[in-house]
Amino acid sequence: MRHSKSGRKLNRTASHRKAMFANMATSLIEHEQIVTTLPKAKEIRPIVEKLVTLGKRGGLHARRQAIAALRDTGKVAKLFDTLAPRYASRNGGYLRIMKAGFRTGDNAPMAVIEFVDRDVEAKGAGDRARIEALENEKGTTS
């Protein structure tokens, strides 16, 4: 019997799940919104919310714990420098999950998971800067 066994296995080994959640958390912190299946979104939400709470706590130990979970120091910096101050006055509930229909092909339920007060202008900012730099290079060489 599986009484009081929390969490979904998602048809993956423990190491695969751990790596997948680390990758999804990194992507969610980077883009502040991702589209995934509904069960994965429900599983990643408490992980990322605990990371934001670590960011709000600050301190060296909290930063090291976040690095161990995310494995990307750049995203940890964003977590501690950008997201933590944004949610300083909010006690939990940093993420929202919105159902997004069903995936074509296998009819899996999809969901959008995003930060509640996310910066809409930041989405794709890296791509816009890269494209703008390429256009400037073309303009100077022509």
UniProtKB/Swiss-Prot annotation:
InterPro entries hit by this protein: Ribosomal_bL17, Ribosomal_bL17_CS, Ribosomal_bL17_sf
Any one cellular-component term (Gene Ontology): cytosolic large ribosomal subunit
Biological process terms from the Gene Ontology for this record are: translation
Any matching Pfam family: Ribosomal_L17
Q: Which GO terms describe its molecular function?
A: structural constituent of ribosome
Keyword Ribosomal protein on entry: yes
**The keyword Ribosomal protein is assigned to this record:** yes
**Gene3D superfamilies in the cross-refs:** Ribosomal protein L17 (3.90.1030.10)
Origin superkingdom: Bacteria
Q: Which UniProt keywords apply?
A: Ribonucleoprotein, Ribosomal protein
By sequence similarity, the record places it as follows:
Belongs to the bacterial ribosomal protein bL17 family.
Q: What is the protein's quaternary organization?
A: Part of the 50S ribosomal subunit. Contacts protein L32.
Q: What name does this protein carry?
A: Large ribosomal subunit protein bL17
